[in-house]
C-alpha cells in the first residue's frame, strides 16, 4: 500500500512527491518538463499497453521537438509516476481557458497505471499532484470522463469527486459540408 509521504521536494519549479510502500521501492511523481521527452515516450507506451491500443500511442509518436513543445505548453500537463527510472503511471491533462470568466478548468484526458503497480495509490497520487498543479494555475475544477464498465476508474473518481451524468458525442470534422 502506498502512502503519501511528507517528503515533497522540488525539481526545478515542478513539484515532485515521493511515495513509499512496504514491499516495493520508492515511487515518485512529478510533472514532466520539455527536457523529459524520453519519459513522455515511456508514458505514451504505458498508455498504449494498458489501454490495449499500442498502434495509437506507440507506433506513430510525434518527433521529439513536437513532444518538447507540448511539454512546454501552458495548456498541457503530463504527470508521471516512477519506480526507480521506469514510468509506472501517467496522467495527461489539458488546461482549458474559459471565455465567460477569466478562469480555467482542467480535463484529465488519459490516466493509466501499469498492471503490476495497480491498487497501490498511484492513480490517486497522480490526481493529487494534478490538484496542486490546478491550484497553482488558478483552475477552478478538474474533470474526467469514465466509461460504463470501467469499474475501477468509476470507483476511483467517485472517491475523489462528484459524479455528473453527461452525454458525449464524437463529431467527425471530415463530414463538413
Swiss-Prot record:
Annotated segments matching region Disordered: 1-22
Keywords, in A-Z order: Acyltransferase, Antibiotic resistance, Plasmid, Transferase, Transposable element
Coiled-coil region: none
Record organism: Pseudomonas aeruginosa
Family matches, as SUPFAM superfamilies: Acyl-CoA N-acyltransferases (Nat) (SSF55729)
GO terms under biological process: response to antibiotic
Catalytic activity of the protein: gentamicin C + acetyl-CoA = N(3)-acetylgentamycin C + CoA + H(+)
Record's keyword annotation contains S-adenosyl-L-methionine: no
Protein name per Swiss-Prot or TrEMBL: Gentamicin 3-N-acetyltransferase
Biased composition, class Polar residues, residue ranges: 1-14
Function: Responsible for gentamicin resistance and has a limited substrate range.
Name of a matching Pfam family: Acetyltransf_1
Occurrences of domain N-acetyltransferase (ranges): 25-177
